[in-house]
């Protein structure tokens, strides 16, 4: 079968395009020269034009140096008269390509060996994936999937660790809140249930009973005896006794702090009363010493007592001077 005009550019100079025919028995193109190996190269280039685009992408990256070596080997055979046996064996190797694109299946024959360099691995994987999607995954894809799964596993572990950390933090916070609630409840119990309110109430009841007994036995504005909590006896006026009685009766319904404050005020009143008693006794002594001072007020009594003491001092000094003179 003669070649068309588009295929003439693949033929070297000095060859007749009409002499390149197809041998049906051997299934490859043979030019009208005594070198069938060179005809295989031209037949492969002719078949390349009838391949589908995926196969064209494969065959377009065929190593041209191998083709050149075959041509140089053929040229050496023409000059020397014999070719190496290895070159003939390599040139006789053929590859069959199945084209299953569309609904048709075609059998194509390639006249030269296909070699896939390391740079074509990615493209080969893409073409195989397009032809057979279920088998088109290479080892690199498997490794990448393993890496992605490992990263997802690590991310899942990190997420689980973060979740566990947050749960522990929440548990600690809730435990702190529970502890605070327990402390508050303990404080409330200590302020209400554990307070010695009953003892103080019993003491107040004892004082009120003693005051009632003293009032029933004594009538009028007389001094009365009051027995305190420390079992000490002090004199007190009837008005003070009345106030203490009212306070003692009202202390039963008062809290612990009020009872302690009332006790402190009671002790302060007793101290103040003792001071007043001492002042009254001193004023009575001055009234008895200073002539004409009975029935006077305390300030006037003090002034007269001072003047009287000065007069006594002067008289004493004058008497000493007279004694020294004699």
Curated annotation (Swiss-Prot):
Origin: domain of life: Eukaryota
Record region (Disordered): 175-194, 234-275
Subcellular localization(s) per the UniProt record: Nucleus
Keywords for the protein's UniProt record, in alphabetical order: DNA-binding, Nucleus, Transcription, Transcription regulation
A Pfam family annotated for this UniProt entry: bHLH_SAC51
One cellular-component annotation, GO: nucleus
Single GO MF descriptor: DNA-binding transcription factor activity
Biological-process GO terms, alphabetical: regulation of DNA-templated transcription
InterPro entries per record: bHLH_dom, HLH_DNA-bd_sf, SAC51-like
Matches recorded under SUPFAM superfamilies: HLH, helix-loop-helix DNA-binding domain (SSF47459)
Bias kind Acidic residues: ranges: 175-189
Residue ranges of domain bHLH in the record: 263-312
Biased composition (Polar residues): 255-271
First and last residue of the signal peptide: none
Quaternary structure note: Homodimer.
Record-given protein name: Transcription factor bHLH143
Annotated source species: Arabidopsis thaliana
